[in-house]
Amino acid sequence: MEMEALDILFEDLAHPNPYIQSQAFMAMVRDWPQQALPRLLGLLAQPNITLRRASVRGIGAFGAAALLPLADLLKASTDSTIRASCVKAYAQVASNQPGIHFPESAMKALEEALSDDSPVVAVATVMALGQVGGQAMPLLLRVVGGDNPAQAVAAVNALAQIDHPAIERTLRDLQNQPQVDSYVRETIESALARMSDLHARQPQPG
C-alpha cells in the first residue's frame, strides 16, 4: 500500500503541470527519501523530455543527499543524455540551496565533465559551476584561460553571476592577457560593463 502511494507520486511527476510535479517531488523528499531518489536517478535516461526535466528538478530538491549519487552516475554513465541531466541536477541543487558545500567527489565529477566528449555536457557543466558559486571559481577560471572559446565564454558569464569580491579584478586581469581569444575578451568586457552597471545601481551606504 505504501509503495502504491509512491507510485502515484511518480505518476504525478509525469503530469504536464509543473505545480503538480513540484508537489509530487516535495512529497517524495518529505516521505520517501530513501526509495524515491534512486528511482529519480533512474529516470534521467527517460526519453520523455517532460518527465526527464521533472526528474532533474526532483533530484535538485533532495539537496546534499543527491550530491554523491549524482557523482557516481555522472562518472559511470556512457549516455550523454544522462550525464547532461546529472550536471543539470547539480545546478538545481546549487540553485535551491545557495552556498551549499559540494564534497570533493562531486567537484571532481564536475571537473571531469568539463572535458566531456559531448559539447552539451561540457557547456552545461560550466553553467552548473556558475550556480555552485565561489567554490567553483578555480575551475571556471581555468576554463576561461583554456583553448575552448565556447566554454570560455560560458565560463565568463558564469563567473559574472558569482557574488565574490575577487571576480571583477580577476576578469580585468584576464582581459589584458594577450592569449585570450578575441570573442572571449569581448565577453569579458560585456560582463565587466554589466557588473559596473549593477554596482552603480546599488544603494550607497548613507
Question: What is each model feature region?
Answer:
Residues 5-6, 37, 67, 103-107, ...:
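Core helices of alpha-solenoid repeat scaffolds
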Residues 202-206:
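Short acidic DE-rich linear segments
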